[in-house]
A protein has these predicted regions:
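Short loop/turn segments that flank or connect secondary-structure elements
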Residues: 1-155
Length: 155
């Protein structure tokens, strides 16, 4: 069952704290901003946010006044993320889901000056488990995950 508004705010604050830890552990990692990972038909993959992550995305989309109307027709088969702006940047970058934060794209580059090194898998796995647990507290009947494209299709 979904919690009260105060509980939801606390759980969302916990989610943002997990995101901050993930971002810190990935400090220095970059990508070339090709937006390949934001075009699910190109990579054949897409993030599956949990219920609590979806609530955070909804909050961020509401805060910016909704999603913009697309000015151009989508490229067939591209399956572009609804959160990708026409400028190639995420419209809700600070609230992007865990999957978007953790460089699931092969284009990720390790921090400059450190040579090639692996992503911190233990920290990523721990954070993933914490988000799943948090989502179960947030919405025990339907904690997720769900395909991001299906979630945003109704926005």
């Amino acid at each position: 069952m979904r919690r009260g508004q105060d509980d939801s705010k606390k759980l969302l604050a916990e989610l943002r704290a997990i995101y901050a830890r993930v971002d810190s552990s990935l400090g220095g990692w970059t990508c070339d901003a090709s937006t390949d990972c934001c075009r699910f038909g190109v990579t054949g993959r897409e993030p599956y946010p949990t219920a609590i992550e979806i609530a955070e995305l909804e909050r961020a989309v509401r805060a910016r006044g909704g999603l913009p109307k697309r000015r151009v027709l989508p490229v067939a088969g591209e399956r572009r993320c609804a959160l990708l702006g026409d400028d190639g940047k995420c419209l809700v970058y600070a609230s992007r889901p865990f999957g978007c934060r953790t460089f699931y794209c092969e284009r990720a580059k390790s921090p400059v000056g450190e040579g090639v090194r692996a992503l911190p898998k233990n920290e990523i796995n721990d954070a993933s488990r914490a988000i799943v647990d948090l989502s179960a507290k947030f919405d025990a009947r339907n904690p997720g995950p769900r395909p991001l494209s299906k979630v945003t299709a109704t926005w």
